[in-house]
A protein has these predicted regions:
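Helix-loop boundary and gating motifs at the non-cytosolic
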Residues: 2-57, 236-241, 245-263
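Juxtamembrane intracellular "pre-TM" segments in multi-pass secondary transporters
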Residues: 3-6, 203-238
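Loop-to-transmembrane helix entry/capping segments in MFS-fold secondary transporters
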Residues: 43-46, 134-144, 267, 352-362
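Central cavity-lining transmembrane alpha-helices of secondary-active solute carriers
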Residues: 51-67, 276-284
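Helix-to-loop junctions at the C-terminal end of transmembrane segments
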Residues: 64-75, 284-296
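Structural signature of the two symmetry-related core transmembrane helices
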Residues: 79-93, 300-313
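Helix-loop junctions at membrane interfaces in 12-TM secondary transporters
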Residues: 97-108, 316-327
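Conserved small/polar residues in nucleotide/adenosyl-binding loops
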Residues: 400-407
Length: 407
């Protein structure tokens, strides 16, 4: 396969992972609670943050398979990717211009930025079979995730330094630095998306169609594929299992920083843990794929599920920053591996000519899973904070009761 296309494709993970680290997992949850929302009521902030994540996931889940079918019919994978990436980039830039106390606007902009991020990932994933073959698809998938962790880790370190030492960057205070951190994510995302847009070629499996014809034929294809899915037992079984275990993974990714903040850890400690996850995950993902190739991809997923069960169990007992860093280390060991193997295994069992549509179903179930975890986490926090005086105990319970990875 063309190495330029492989690295151009993988570099998009480097580009958009800045949103996942700096915005989604890092600064937005804390900034939303302390600047845009009410800093005296963390439980309410957690609830609205979980609700926002769930709304974004639900919208993407409903659109994913239909847009995937349309993209397959009209060879619109790259076009749809660019559209959603543009939406995410613009909304992320917009986070840097929202005034204090404007939590409804901040939440709405965050929802749209998350839709852009998640929507683009559908079509990014669907291009994986186009830039790889049966021999290297596992390594290419792992390369994307590992570069994502490295790129996200580099930018969050820069952003953390900006917020910790704003004067050195010519900024007034940490608030201004945080807003510029959001802007830097948008710029980073846009800049490193360019190679994919220029060098990754999208194969055509159908005759060229107008957008209107692609919509009509795509809807017909979606209906037919949905019916055929009942006959494809391997794909259907995998999707069901994926729906069950990815919820735990997504909930930990999206809500870990807010969980740590609720436990009373300071921002520096939380950011240090996020950087640790990124750096460990960069190496762990590349190693994990080698282990999975040795023991089998299916067993590799089982190993990741077991790892996340241990992580969630350990999270219940977190009391000190040392405990939190141990949990962060464990997350880094398993997070990228289970995501990468899931993607590459799924690519092996679906027809390439319908990759966008099938990845639509893949992302639909992933997003439906992400609907329940964050909103359950926020709801449990809100409920327990009203009946338990010890905020730390409430935080422990909400993590433990969020859906854990299962098979």
């Amino acid at each position: 396969m063309n190495k330029k296309q492989i690295y151009s494709w993988a570099l998009y993970d480097w580009a958009n992972s800045a949103f996942a680290t700096t915005v989604m997992a890092g600064f937005f949850p804390i900034f939303f609670s302390q600047y845009w929302s009410n800093p005296d009521n963390l439980s309410v902030s957690t609830f609205y943050l979980g609700l926002g994540n769930s709304i974004a996931s639900l919208i993407v889940a409903l659109l994913a398979p239909i847009l995937g079918a349309i993209a397959d019919r009209g060879s619109y994978k790259k076009k749809f990717l660019i559209f959603f990436a543009f939406l995410g980039i613009v909304m992320t830039l917009g986070l840097g211009f929202i005034a204090q106390g404007m939590w409804p606007i901040a939440l709405l902009v965050y929802i749209f930025s998350t839709i852009g991020f998640s929507g683009a990932n559908i079509f990014y994933d669907s291009l994986l079979p186009s830039v790889s073959n049966e021999k290297n698809i596992d390594d290419v998938s792992a390369l994307g995730f590992s570069l994502g962790y490295l790129g996200g880790g580099i930018l969050i370190i820069i952003n953390f330094l900006m917020i910790s030492y704003p004067a050195y960057f010519g900024l007034v205070d940490a608030v201004e630095a945080t807003k510029y951190a959001f802007i830097s994510v948008g710029v980073w995302w846009a800049l490193f998306s360019i190679p994919l847009m220029l060098f990754v070629e999208e194969p055509k499996f159908h005759e060229s169609e107008s957008l209107s014809d692609s919509v009509i034929n795509g809807l017909i294809q979606f209906r037919n594929t949905f019916n055929d899915l009942k006959k494809l037992k391997v794909v259907a079984t995998f999707l069901l299992a994926y729906w069950l275990y990815i919820d735990g993974v997504d909930t930990v990714v999206r809500m870990a920083a807010n969980f740590a903040f609720t436990l009373g850890f300071d921002q520096a400690s939380i950011m240090g843990a996020l950087v640790l996850i990124q750096l460990v995950a960069f190496f762990a993902t590349l190693i994990y794929i080698k282990i999975a190739n040795y023991i089998g991809l299916k067993n590799g997923i089982y190993l990741g599920i077991l790892g996340y069960c241990v992580i969630l169990f350990a999270g219940y007992f977190v009391e000190s920053i040392t405990h939190f860093y141990v949990v962060a280390l464990l997350i880094g060991c398993f997070q990228g591996g289970i995501q990468s193997i899931s993607r590459s295994l799924y690519s092996r069992i679906i027809p390439e000519q319908k990759s966008a549509e099938f990845y639509g179903f893949y992302n639909m179930l992933g997003k439906f899973a992400a609907v329940f975890g964050p909103v359950l986490m926020g709801s449990v926090t809100l409920f327990l904070s009203n009946i338990v005086d010890d905020e730390i105990r409430a935080a422990r319970c909400l993590l433990y009761t969020s859906p854990s990875p299962r098979d």
